[in-house]
Amino acid sequence: MKIKNDFKLREICGEYVVTAEGMQAVDFTKLISLNETAAFLWKTAEKQGEFTVASLAQALCDEYYVVMAQAEKDCEAIVAQWQKEGLV
């Protein structure tokens, strides 16, 4: 998977939000807010270019004190949400 180029993570007033740029922004009627951990995963996905749930889960385990099974479950949930919103 890959994050679509039209979406960018921004920190606005201490909050992480995903914003649309270019033509996608015309129909973008809501901001997508991310917590700190989700923002970390977004940044990791951007760095990786092509990413998988497994690669994000490994990065989560490397950065935070979390077991792989929980990291995979959490990453599956956030990636599913990103897919639902059309971000990846």
Q: At which residue positions do the language-model features occur?
A:
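Long, charge-rich, low-complexity alpha-helical segments
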Residues: 30-88
